[in-house]
From Swiss-Prot:
CDD domains linked to this entry: GT28_MurG
List of residues binding UDP-N-acetyl-alpha-D-glucosamine: 13-15, 125, 162, 190, 244, 289
Chief location bin: membrane
Organism expressing this protein natively: Neisseria meningitidis serogroup C (strain 053442)
Example GO molecular function: undecaprenyldiphospho-muramoylpentapeptide beta-N-acetylglucosaminyltransferase activity
Catalytic activity: di-trans,octa-cis-undecaprenyl diphospho-N-acetyl-alpha-D-muramoyl-L-alanyl-D-glutamyl-meso-2,6-diaminopimeloyl-D-alanyl-D-alanine + UDP-N-acetyl-alpha-D-glucosamine = di-trans,octa-cis-undecaprenyl diphospho-[N-acetyl-alpha-D-glucosaminyl-(1->4)]-N-acetyl-alpha-D-muramoyl-L-alanyl-D-glutamyl-meso-2,6-diaminopimeloyl-D-alanyl-D-alanine + UDP + H(+)
Keyword Transferase attributed: yes
This protein's name: UDP-N-acetylglucosamine--N-acetylmuramyl-(pentapeptide) pyrophosphoryl-undecaprenol N-acetylglucosamine transferase
Record's subcellular location: Cell inner membrane
Record keywords: Cell cycle, Cell division, Cell inner membrane, Cell membrane, Cell shape, Cell wall biogenesis/degradation, Glycosyltransferase, Membrane, Peptidoglycan synthesis, Transferase
EC code(s) of this entry: 2.4.1.227
InterPro entries: GlcNAc_MurG, Glyco_trans_28_C, GlycoTrans_28_N
Gene Ontology biological process: carbohydrate metabolic process; cell division; cell wall organization; lipid glycosylation; peptidoglycan biosynthetic process; regulation of cell shape
Length: 355
């Protein structure tokens, strides 16, 4: 068997899992072997095996904001999970671990540290998560997507995204020849965002019919019926779907996106070259979505609209002020932020550390 063996540690949310999958693809394309350390009863347990990657799991959940009983049990739980992670590392003869964040990353990283196995971390958000902050002290390489997440020199690599998104034509080429109403894409993540589902139809109803953009709105799981009913009741036309399976085409055809500001969303917007009205999820850990959004706004690639300020009237005012020229400018500015080789950069850093 040729190639080295890498253990990717990521879980909890798609924002950790999908960038790690992109790196896994890059490592395997180079002839290396990948296993995955995740949590039991988790999103990664459902997703990762579909990609043909061996999944090992630890019985661990997050502690921030949880009950006193779980916090009191933390030392015992950590001891158990570190021991189990050590067993997994030895079993697979892992030569380097790569941490992307999530509950499982810390015990996996600590196990690697105790065994003398090199650690690489990749931070997807503008504010580093708890696991990665701790592991950064021991990591051989600290990589990050946003300039201020860490101060380690040479670590800015961006967030890994799918190649078919990065390979979209540049904004000027996509926008060429477009006329008529703006085409706006609304996405609140796979589960949707209730506040967007409620406010966007109301805002459009406040605009004159000839000033309303053409909407393509992802409702999120289980919310399509109520969203379509709201649009219909307000007399607003919109194309609503529960889940968009072809995001590449959705990005290609849109002039603008209304969305949350998760790390993966920001990475895809910049890779595609699309401006956005960003409504950060207000309860994200360390309010990292607001910091993510500011990264785009400071580059004049969109607007930040805090959820506390999101009203139908405010959104209607913003939408009424937009034109395709402004959307194109935002899209071009977004594209300048893209780091399209991120997955390969992370993979190559890990390969060097395992040497």
């Amino acid at each position: 068997m040729g190639g080295k063996t890498f253990m990717l540690m990521a879980g909890g949310t798609g924002g950790h899992i999908f960038p790690a999958l992109a790196v896994a693809d890059s490592l395997r394309a180079r002839g290396h072997h990948v296993i995955w350390l995740g949590s039991k009863d988790s999103m990664e347990e459902r997703i990762v095996p579909q990609y043909g990657i061996r999944l090992e799991t630890l019985a661990i959940k997050g502690v921030r904001g949880n009950g006193i009983k779980r916090k009191l049990m933390l030392p015992f739980t950590l001891y158990q999970t570190v021991r189990e992670a050590q067993r997994i590392i030895r079993k697979h003869r892992v030569e380097c671990v790569i941490g992307f964040g999530g509950f499982v990353t810390f015990p996996g990283g600590l196990a690697a540290k105790l065994l003398g196995v090199p650690i690489v971390i990749h931070e997807q958000n503008a504010v580093a998560g708890l696991s990665n902050r701790h592991l950064s002290r021991w990591a051989k390489r600290v990589l990050y997507a946003f300039p201020k997440a860490f101060s380690h020199e040479g670590g800015l690599v961006g967030n890994p995204v799918r190649a078919d998104i990065s390979n979209l034509p540049v904004p000027a080429e996509r926008f060429q020849g477009r006329e008529g109403r703006l085409k706006i894409l609304v996405v609140g993540g796979s589960l949707g965002a209730d506040v967007l589902n409620k406010t966007v139809p109301q805002a459009l109803a406040l605009l004159p019919d000839n000033a309303r953009p053409q909407m393509y709105h992802q409702s999120g799981r289980g919310k399509l019926g109520s969203l379509q009913a709201d649009y219909d009741a307000l007399g607003v036309q919109a194309e609503c779907v529960e889940f968009i399976t072809d995001m590449v085409s959705a990005y290609r055809d849109a002039d603008l996106v209304i969305c949350r500001a998760g790390a993966l969303t920001i990475a895809e917007l910049t890779a595609a070259g699309l401006g956005a009205l960003l409504v950060p999820y207000p309860h994200a850990v360390d309010d990292h979505q607001t910091a993510n959004a500011r990264f785009m706004v400071q580059a004049e690639a969109g607007l930040l609209l805090p959820q506390t300020q999101l009203t139908a009237e405010k959104l209607a005012e913003i939408l009424g002020s937009l034109n395709r020229e402004k959307c194109l400018k935002w899209a071009e500015n977004a594209r300048t932020l893209a780091l399209p080789h991120s997955a390969d950069d992370v993979a190559e850093a890990a390969i060097a550390c395992a040497a």
